[in-house]
UniProtKB/Swiss-Prot annotation:
Its EC number is 4.1.99.12, 3.5.4.25. The keyword Cell wall biogenesis/degradation does not apply. Binds 2 divalent metal cations per subunit. Magnesium or manganese. Binds 1 zinc ion per subunit. This is Riboflavin biosynthesis protein RibBA. Mg(2+) 1 binds at residue 27. Pathway: Cofactor biosynthesis; riboflavin biosynthesis; 2-hydroxy-3-oxobutyl phosphate from D-ribulose 5-phosphate: step 1/1; Cofactor biosynthesis; riboflavin biosynthesis; 5-amino-6-(D-ribitylamino)uracil from GTP: step 1/4. CDD domains: GTP_cyclohydro2 (cd00641). It comes from the Bacteria. The gene is ribBA. Zn(2+) binds at residues 255, 266, 268. PANTHER family: 3,4-DIHYDROXY-2-BUTANONE 4-PHOSPHATE SYNTHASE, GTP CYCLOHYDROLASE II-RELATED. Gene3D superfamilies: DHBP synthase, GTP cyclohydrolase II. It catalyses: D-ribulose 5-phosphate = (2S)-2-hydroxy-3-oxobutyl phosphate + formate + H(+); GTP + 4 H2O = 2,5-diamino-6-hydroxy-4-(5-phosphoribosylamino)-pyrimidine + formate + 2 phosphate + 3 H(+). Its cofactor is Mg(2+); Mn(2+); Zn(2+).
Amino acid sequence: MFHRIEEALEDLKQGKVIIVCDDKNRENEGDFLALAEYITPETINFMITHGRGLVCVPLPEHYAKRLQLEPMVSQNTDSHHTAFTVSIDHISTTTGISAHERATTVRELLNPSSKGSDFNRPGHIFPLIAKDGGVLRRAGHTEAAVDLAKLCGTEPVGVICEIIKEDGTMARVPDLIQVAKQFDIKMITIEDLIAYRRHHETFVTKEVEITLPTEFGTFHAIGYTNSLDQKEHIALIKGDVSTDEPVLVRVHSECLTGDVFGSCRCDCGPQLHAALTQIEREGRGVLLYMRQEGRGIGLLNKLRAYKLQEEGLDTVEANEKLGFPADLRDYGIGAQILKDLGLQKLRLLTNNPRKIAGLQGYELEIVERVPLQMPTKQENKTYLQTKVTKLGHLLNL
């Protein structure tokens, strides 16, 4: 049904059109997408004939500034905040509406010598300003077009057109599948593009290294930042972990209430202390402390979830009541830090199969799962039972 991002990139590099939709939900809509660098009148004509939507040109903000493309409106009230600029035609065109003249306008947007005065306003091409960070910041077709152009190594500008059915209604995923088959077009999702970028790009930066004496032992501490959400993480390292021998690793998500205040609602604090103790005892290992409070929902939302648990919900139901998944954590940043430290083979201290799968997806080999089970307390018995029954944690209760 859907194609791999690599397949779509190959077609785009050949000047072909692809279809991009938000995700695999059958109610989502789709756009035709092509690279502006390879645009032709034939491609424009295909889009307006079979797509029937508005032909838009997603581009980075610095292109818009260079060409003096001001926002279409001073106050954007669009529900998706699509960043339309004023519409344009190149001054060499006549009416600007034909496929040939629209292709000319697109090509002239890429001309490095073009300036704002080279375009008439309004016109028949609709530039869109993509957010910096692309689909990792805004999961829209605008950002997808610019990201795909960058991944293809061309000018970071795309051409998109919404796909509308012959009866005038929006084409949904089942309709898009038929269109893709009819014209032998690759179809991808923005969801998969996000995953592709997370997997293939590096977002972590090593910022500072210190020696950190603790009550558990002395560790080499390295602080990291990441460009996705600007959160700061820290790795505590014991011994030489750059060899080929498997390394004992604990990826620990921040829990202020458990780690610092000793909350009995969870087993986070005891797990943290036990992991540091075990790493110190073995003389070699890594504890990666990730700022993912409350399984990724943040401190205040975790407290709100606790409040709902006091009213009878379990930890998963509380998250869902607040509008969050049961577990919002993404292990990609943690995996990149571990790879930056030179790790390849891990003996992972965890009870969570999802954590194993999350790290293995980033080419880290988990050679052994090392259980990290703490004594059950009356206050956290229900919490731990829910982790077993609903989150699949491997605990003997």
